[in-house]
Amino acid sequence: MFMSYEPGDVAEGFELKNANESIGGEMVTLDSVLTKSGAVVLFECNHCPYVVASVDRINRAAEKANQLGMGFVSINSNDPEKYKDDDFSNMKKRAEKGMPYAYLHDDTQEIAHKWGAERTPEFYLLDGQGKVVYRGRLDNSPRDPTMATTSELVDAMDSLSMGEDPVVTRTQSIGCSIKWK
C-alpha cells in the first residue's frame, strides 16, 4: 500500500543520487534541502512537454525560493528503462544546461510512491518542520505561460514566508503521469 502526503502531513526524509552535482553534491537528503523557512520538492522529468514548457517558470520559482530562504529540489522518478530520456546520464546532460537546484534520481520509485506523486510537474511546499503546506501545480497553464491566470505555488511560498497559511493548500497537478515500472 502506498502513502500520499497531503497538506498537514510531515514528510519523511530521503537520500538520493544527484545529477546536478554543482548544487548539493553527489547525494542529497531532504534534511540538507529543508531550511527553517521551508523547501519546495518538485517531481519532474526530462521528456514531459508540460515540464519542458514550464522550465523557465520552474527556474524562477527556484530562484524565488532561494530569495525567501527556502530550499528547492527536484526528483525524477520515471522508469529509466522504458524512458531513456529520463535515465541518469540524460538527467546530468539536462542539469549541465543550467539548473539552479539539485536534480535527484529516484530510480526505485520509492520516494514517488511514498509521497503519492502522480504527475510531472508536481510540487510539494514544506514548512521548516517538513510539514506539507501546499501540494499541486505551479499554475493553471503549464503548457502556455501566457494563458496562466493563477500562481498557486508562488502564492503559497509568499504566504509561508510571511508566517501565514497558504490560502490554497491543494490543487490538481497538470502534467504527464509518472512512468511506473
List each language-model region with its residue ranges:
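Chalcogenol-based redox active-site neighborhoods
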Residues: 1-170, 177-181
